[in-house]
Amino acid sequence: MLVMNLQLFAHKKGVGSSKNGRDSEAKRLGVKCSDGQFVLAGNILVRQRGTKIHPGLNVGRGGDDTLFAKIDGVVKYERLGRDKKKASVYPVEVEKVVAE
């Protein structure tokens, strides 16, 4: 009497699953207006997490620590002591040109 022992084997390799392969979207943080640049009121100067740069004269701080200009003027980045920085906006006197 012939007894056959049939065993079925996998014909595809078992593939493990990886727990990697995803990343968060970049937040586009950083300085948006450089030193000496003319800005309008409401322009964003710096997008940041925490106060890496502190608000100075005529600069406001948003709820997410974004710094923005309160008036039209020129941006100036200054040092506060050894390890702190501040951003200020100074008004610019505009000369009127009279057509002759």
UniProtKB/Swiss-Prot annotation:
Listed transmembrane segments: none
InterPro entries: Ribosomal_bL27, Ribosomal_bL27_CS
Disulfide bonds: none
Single GO MF annotation: structural constituent of ribosome
Keywords assigned: Ribonucleoprotein, Ribosomal protein
Propeptide: 1-9
Post-translational modification: The N-terminus is cleaved by ribosomal processing cysteine protease Prp.
Pfam families xrefs: Ribosomal_L27 (PF01016)
Gene Ontology biological process terms, A to Z: translation
GO cellular component, one term: cytosolic large ribosomal subunit
Family: Belongs to the bacterial ribosomal protein bL27 family.
Protein name as it appears in the record: Large ribosomal subunit protein bL27
Organism: Clostridium botulinum (strain 657 / Type Ba4)
Name of the encoding gene: rpmA
